[in-house]
UniProtKB/Swiss-Prot annotation:
CTP binds at residues 8, 11, 91, 137, 140. ATP binds at residues 8, 11, 91, 137, 140. It comes from Salmonella typhimurium (strain LT2 / SGSC1412 / ATCC 700720). A single active site specifically recognizes both ATP and CTP and is responsible for their addition. This is Multifunctional CCA protein. It holds the Pfam family PolyA_pol_RNAbd. Mg(2+) binds at residues 21, 23. Signal peptide: none annotated.
Length: 413
């Protein structure tokens, strides 16, 4: 029995990155030998065991053979005669097909170390094409390591295009698509994930609402980058700089979906694109089974992001109605989330990346003023039932009006 550290732990150690999870491969052992050594079996489809002390995963060396469609259509063979090289060959990328023995020696039969140094994401073998989920995994790795200047090998991108054209991605379940997307959205450069998917044709298949934005022009006066798809990825990049929150990043990604519905004869203007985009957000989220809290924020951002941009000319009544619309009284975090997504929208434009966004500050300040109006005083004044809410709203509007006159006066007044 020989035990090797494999995959991501070896890769990240060689890159000088923190190692989070460790996976191990056991060569020359049977399931019974693992059980006798105190390991706990957890894998149903193939033998995976938990170490009795560390609870890290130890998998018996195995091979995989395509036996059906999609990413689940594989037959696994695990036995003592499966070599380490054979186990590593089934992995997706050469940089993940690395192992380290107990003496610290690196086993690298597929030149993963060379590709690490060259900053290349390259598939191990033609078997890559048998698993459509790997298209998304490569896109995610490209996003994860974009700050290290990794790129996808030409032959790997070509294979990803072939897989997409052959309809392989249609076998992916919504849950798996969303899981990879969720992980990609939490990387330092989530926009790279969607750019890679577009480069291989997968964006049109998996995210048609986003793909439809490319080639849709916006007024050059407001959008020097012109292309709405390009702007969308720029705003996502900016959102990633402004916030680590998944919901903020996802909402930013979806903020301009409504522009994909604008008739060509109305280009480059997109009046009403915010409310129009709400149904597309709903459609995308329903198809991919996006969590409800992410969906709800994305719908609000789509509908109201342009309103935030016009904050200086908003009436106090409109500002308080906005807080009502986003349910800020029960979910106050939404004020900050919408401020961040609106800022990402403005700064996610060519030449505006370093711009100040005072509207975000004003929105936050107005919220502090509005929520500081005490409900207790309204009740003590004798108001009852629906009168309480009506009076509370009046007082909130008055408080915001007083604040706005001092801090954010209407430029037209």
């Amino acid at each position: 029995m020989k035990i090797y550290l494999v995959g991501g732990a070896v890769r990240d150690a060689l890159l000088g990155l923190p190692v989070k999870d460790k996976d191990w491969v056991v060569v020359g052992a049977t399931p019974q030998e693992m059980l006798d050594a105190g390991y706990q079996q957890v894998g149903r489809d193939f033998p995976v065991f938990l170490h009795p002390q560390t609870h890290e995963e130890y998998a018996l060396a195995r091979t995989e053979r395509k036996s059906g469609s999609g990413y689940t259509g594989f037959t696994c063979y695990a036995a003592p005669d499966v070599t380490l090289e054979a186990d590593l060959q089934r992995r997706d990328l050469t940089i993940n097909a690395l192992a380290r023995d107990d003496a610290g020696q690196i086993i690298d039969p597929y030149h993963g170390r060379r590709d690490l140094e060259a900053r290349l994401l390259r598939h191990v073998s033609p078997a890559f094409g048998e698993d459509p989920l790997r298209v998304l995994r490569v896109a995610r790795f490209a996003a994860r390591y974009a700050h290290l200047s990794f790129r996808i090998a030409d032959e790997t991108l070509a294979l990803m295009r072939e897989m997409t054209a052959a309809g392989e991605l249609e076998h992916l379940t919504p849950e798996r698509v969303w899981k990879e997307t969720e992980n990609a959205l939490t990387t330092r450069n989530p926009q790279v994930y969607f750019q890679v998917l577009r480069d291989c044709g997968a964006l049109r298949v998996l995210f048609p609402e986003i793909d439809a934005l490319f080639g849709v022009p916006a007024p050059a006066k407001w959008h020097p980058e012109i292309d709405t798809g390009v702007h969308t990825l720029m705003t996502l990049s900016m959102a990633a700089m402004l916030s680590p929150q998944l919901d903020v990043r996802f909402a930013t990604l979806c903020h301009d979906l409504g522009k994909g519905l604008t008739p060509k004869n109305l280009w480059p203007r997109h009046h009403g694109h915010g409310p129009a985009g709400v149904k597309l957000v709903e459609q995308l989220c329903q198809r991919l089974r996006v969590p409800n809290d992410l969906r709800d924020l994305a719908k609000l951002v789509a509908e109201y992001h342009d309103l935030i941009h016009t904050f200086p000319i908003l009436q106090p009544k409109t500002i308080v109605k906005l807080f009502d619309a986003i349910d800020a009284w029960r979910k106050p975090q939404r004020v900050e989330q919408i401020a961040l997504t609106s800022e990402a929208d403005v700064r996610g434009r060519t030449g505006f990346e370093a711009s100040d966004y005072p509207q975000g500050r004003w929105l936050r300040e107005a919220w502090q003023v509005a929520q500081a109006v005490p409900t207790k005083e309204v009740v003590e004044a004798g108001f009852k039932g629906i009168e309480i809410r009506e009076e509370l709203t009046k007082r909130r509007i008055a408080a915001v009006a007083n604040w706005k006159e001092k801090r954010c006066p209407n430029p037209a007044s």
